[in-house]
Regions:
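Charge-dense, helix-prone N-terminal extensions
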Residues: 1-110
Length: 110
């Protein structure tokens, strides 16, 4: 799950144009992405994942996205984060729109 510093810089500077509303912080071997202090995504293994729920999951699934998962003690754990499609990464307007939408999602801690 390593994340290279150059990839974090690419995400923050190149993809989000250095927008000060977008920040990144290390978390559990990955990096959390925040919009105005609210987590909306993660970077893991130099891949970008955005938070999803019933309000936006179809946008990810219809584009062939995969859900973030990791193995712990031989058990696969899935988190409500989905791989960001390349077409969204390459479109600054859509990227910010998706980031804002994902930042509004409140996850239940069951």
């Amino acid at each position: 799950m390593t994340v290279t510093p150059s990839f974090i810089e690419y995400v923050l500077v190149d993809l989000f144009a250095g927008d000060p509303a977008i920040t990144a912080r290390p978390m559990f071997g990955a990096v959390g992405l925040y919009f105005e202090g609210k987590i909306f995504g993660i970077i893991s293994a130099d891949q970008v994942y955005f938070k999803a729920d019933k309000s936006n999951i179809r946008s990810f699934v219809s584009r062939g996205s995969e859900q973030f998962s990791y193995m712990k003690n031989g058990i696969e754990h899935r988190l409500p984060y989905w791989l960001l499609p390349a077409e969204i990464l390459e479109n600054p307007h859509l990227l910010m729109k998706w980031a804002k939408k994902s930042s509004m999602i409140e996850l239940n801690s069951n």
